[in-house]
Amino acid sequence: MKELRRSALGLLLGLLLLVLNAFASWNSAATEKSGRSDAINRHITMLKLGKAQEKAAAAYWLGQQHIAAAPAIDPLVSLLGDTSEVDPVKYRSSKLPARMTLGEEAAAALVNIGHPSIDALIRVLKSSPVAEARKNAAWALGALHDTGATTQI
């Protein structure tokens, strides 16, 4: 009988440790997701309040977050018509032209965010009075290779 109690107690302790470990893993993932959300929100704020170079760096960073940065779509779309020149060498490691516009960087970020950007890009292409915004939206839609977008235009 004593051995049965020990076995049951051992099983109970093992189960408790398993539950605690699962909770710790879940909590760690939730904390990481919360930290990423905070960083995305900080970069979205930078899109709205920063100088052109800071906005471009924020747009690039958001694009690197892919679909997780979907909350940044509207602020990025609002930059598509911005012709301010930026220097991507200051925040990108890859070889790029020495100069590009903030609107072009925003378009590239929207492409990296992916499919959730399509409706907003179509809206810009159809209704923006700013030619540069329409040009960047058209480029982004082409880069997304979504054949369904052509039927909506």
Model-flagged regions — what are they?
Residues 2-3, 21, 27:
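Intrinsically disordered, low-complexity polyampholyte segments enriched for Lys and acidic residues
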Residues 10-22:
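Bacterial N-terminal signal peptides
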Residues 11-12, 61, 140, 153:
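A periodicity- and composition-biased signal for non-globular, repetitive helical segments
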Residues 25-35, 53-68, 89-115, 123, ...:
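Structural detector for internal amphipathic alpha-helices that build alpha-solenoid repeat scaffolds
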Residues 33-48, 67-91, 115-126, 146-153:
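Amphipathic alpha-helical scaffolding segments comprising HEAT/armadillo-like alpha-solenoid repeats
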